[in-house]
Amino acid sequence: MFLPHMNHLTLEQTFFSQVLPKTVKLFDDMMYELTSQARGLSSQNLEIQTTLRNILQTMVQLLGALTGCVQHICATQESIILENIQSLPSSVLHIIKSTFVHCKNSESVYSGCLHLVSDLLQALFKEAYSLQKQLMELLDMVCMDPLVDDNDDILNMVIVIHSLLDICSVISSMDHAFHANTWKFIIKQSLKHQSIIKSQLKHKDIITSLCEDILFSFHSCLQLAEQMTQSDAQDNADYRLFQKTLKLCRFFANSLLHYAKEFLPFLSDSCCTLHQLYLQIHSKFPPSLYATRISKAHQEEIAGAFLVTLDPLISQLLTFQPFMQVVLDSKLDLPCELQFPQCLLLVVVMDKLPSQPKEVQTLWCTDSQVSETTTRISLLKAVFYSFEQCSGELSLPVHLQGLKSKGKAEVAVTLYQHVCVHLCTFITSFHPSLFAELDAALLNAVLSANMITSLLAMDAWCFLARYGTAELCAHHVTIVAHLIKSCPGECYQLINLSILLKRLFFFMAPPHQLEFIQKFSPKEAENLPLWQHISFQALPPELREQTVHEVTTVGTAECRKWLSRSRTLGELESLNTVLSALLAVCNSAGEALDTGKQTAIIEVVSQLWAFLNIKQVADQPYVQQTFSLLLPLLGFFIQTLDPKLILQAVTLQTSLLKLELPDYVRLAMLDFVSSLGKLFIPEAIQDRILPNLSCMFALLLADRSWLLEQHTLEAFTQFAEGTNHEEIVPQCLSSEETKNKVVSFLEKTGFVDETEAAKVERVKQEKGIFWEPFANVTVEEAKRSSLQPYAKRARQEFPWEEEYRSALHTIAGALEATESLLQKGPAPAWLSMEMEALQERMDKLKRYIHTLG
């Protein structure tokens, strides 16, 4: 092709600007004609076939002519300024894109007659390929002076880059190498002219396209790995394609890494896309429940070649506040498959933060009100919240790569271990100015309604107690003790705090334990709510003996006080606290509990047992709690109990088991029954106790509660191994189902045969079902509820609520007045009958409420 020898600007003004727009129109018209006529193409219709082939041939020639124009510009010695040839790149890119789109859609355009024109379509594609390659060579020669602010030149370069970006989306599935080279050119030109075009580039479009291509190539890689895993024979062609695709993954990831590094300040609106990229990749990769099943070798290959590039990307984004906001958004609502990757991401952030400046750590580790509608929670709160969502991964459990230690092989660890180890490591590097945030986050998590989250926080807190100073541990124990004393009644937060107190107490230095004893003296009954939660094994021998003596003395005295008074139900709550403290003594005092103290406890327990009857235990929650505390106390002293008392206990429990009682009551019965395995029952009462024992075990083994079932199997095994009355063991197995259940337990085989894949699918379904009710609850709402240990559930307003409260307040006042009168003098004969009548009315109301519920 011949072009006159003139400078670029003159060529643009006299030729390109005049001819190229007409060329584009001509090409578009030919493309329209092709698409319209292609419907009638057939091997019989030679006229249409000839027409289409002529059009395609003309297009090939036109592309060749354009290539000649581009080559002419490249061949000149003149420096290339984009504004001087602005018609050429835009026209050429339009034609190239149109060509590639047509080639991509050729199967649907030409339907079953593609073979009639396939040779020309291939030629057309090759010409477009050559034209783009030549154009990129030309564009690489373009000079843009960073000191000259030429808006037209800047705009032209931005248009060129985004036009190439559009072409990328077309050719991504057509030619991987060409696709990668086009991306390489886009990144290169963006960085080359960065200082001039950085404010004009549509960074979000570039990042989004890159992330889409990363995900597409990654999914292709996984599909190939899955096919090779499922296939018995190793196909070298498949493996080469896998390696090629993996290489493409790495290229795209490195391109993203490079681009993000240079243009980070402009990526505010791309942070959500980058966050989703990380989550989507890890959701499809083992050990995610939603991962593609691939071999260990392929996992390691993908991780080593591709996943490693995500780590420096997170390092780059760590200091970028918009990324923090996306990751720690209080309203972040992720689907089930992305919750586990979010947890992994937060752990990665924890690992990287210690190397960051204090200012960055502070931003990540503190709450922030970003706007009226947007709140950023702290990293630690986010870790606990995210961890709580991984119920399926925790229950399987999934395993992750463990930490390497000197002289030991690396072992896989559970998600719980993974998070716990990294959390504790993070705590060691926590900046002192952020300790208040650490304390608040740990306490908030300990008070969580989710048991495993609370346990994780306790483990981290115990690590802090050991890692920190003795004074810090003592301070924390004192705070927890005050929190426990401030709880007005039973709630899950109180249970969590009591477990934490028991564990932390072991880490206290003896001098601080002595201070604790002085501050919360066991000589005072008001402190027994604390001592019921403390293991006396945590104390050194001298302090243990002292506190055991004091708790036992005060506890038995309080029991006698209750026995000597009116013995009202209202006083049972404090009595139950006393019994719980005495039980703690029995369970952990060891040799410090001498014979005299044992006798004193047995005496009051026997007297208290005498006041129990079936109706009270069946109907009254406080009596049920008393009953469930007396049973383990009786079991502890089973060898020294009066046989008549044992008979009474067994008879009462046999009757109660036929009623609907809470699980904790039946578990207490179970503990007592299993303790009878240590006892030789006197012949005089064997005929009355042994049948009841077999009946109790039969009823408990048939229970459908999984928790009770497990404990019953353990208790029955313990009883059967220790009892001298082997003859009743077969009598406990009342059905074939029960026998099979016990045999499976003894042989440690599951009740249900389940493949690993089926187990994963079941856990995924369960996770979706269990999480659904909480999907719309924000972190802020969870935080508010968990910081209030008094409330068992969020308050819900009902019609007439205030009237109900007023009526109950009146009832409570009347009961208090009656109690006061009883303390002043004897009750009239009619009072007992009237109270029975009131009790019946109360029971009727309770039944009515249950039917409404």
Swiss-Prot record:
Localisation per UniProt entry: Chromosome, Centromere, Kinetochore; Nucleus; Chromosome, Centromere; Midbody
Documented effect of changing residue 43 to D: Increased binding to PLK1
Pfam families: DUF4487 (PF14868)
PTM sites of type N6-acetyllysine: 792
Full protein name: FIGNL1-interacting regulator of recombination and mitosis
Presence of keyword Phosphoprotein: yes
Phosphoserine: modified positions: 43, 744
Keyword Nucleus: yes
InterPro entries recorded: DUF4487 (IPR027902)
Superkingdom of the source species: Eukaryota
UniProt GO MF annotations: protein kinase binding
Post-translational changes noted in the entry: Phosphorylation at Ser-43 by PLK1 strengthens FIRRM-PLK1 interaction. Phosphorylation at Ser-744 by PLK1 negatively regulates its interaction with PPP1CC.
PANTHER family assigned to the protein according to its UniProt record, in alphabetical order: CHROMOSOME 1 OPEN READING FRAME 112 (PTHR16071), FIGNL1-INTERACTING REGULATOR OF RECOMBINATION AND MITOSIS (PTHR16071:SF2)
Gene Ontology CC annotations of this record: chromosome, centromeric region; cytosol; kinetochore; midbody; nucleolus; nucleoplasm; nucleus; spindle midzone
Organism: Homo sapiens
Phenotype for residue 744 to D: Decreased binding to PPP1CC. Does not rescue the mitotic defects seen in FIRRM-depleted cells
UniProt keyword list: Acetylation, Centromere, Chromosome, Cytoplasm, Cytoskeleton, Kinetochore, Nucleus, Phosphoprotein
Self-association state and partner proteins as the record states: Interacts (via its N-terminal region) with PLK1; controls PLK1 kinase activity. Interacts (via the KVVXF motif) with PPP1CC; controls PLK1 kinase activity. Interacts with FIGNL1; may regulate homologous recombination.
Result, substituting residue 43 to A: Decreased binding to PLK1
Protein purpose: Regulates PLK1 kinase activity at kinetochores and promotes faithful chromosome segregation in prometaphase by bridging kinase and phosphatase activities. Phosphorylation of FIRRM by PLK1 negatively regulates its interaction with the phosphatase, PPP1CC, thus creating a negative feedback loop for maintaining proper PLK1 kinase activity during mitosis. In complex with FIGL1 may regulate homologous recombination.
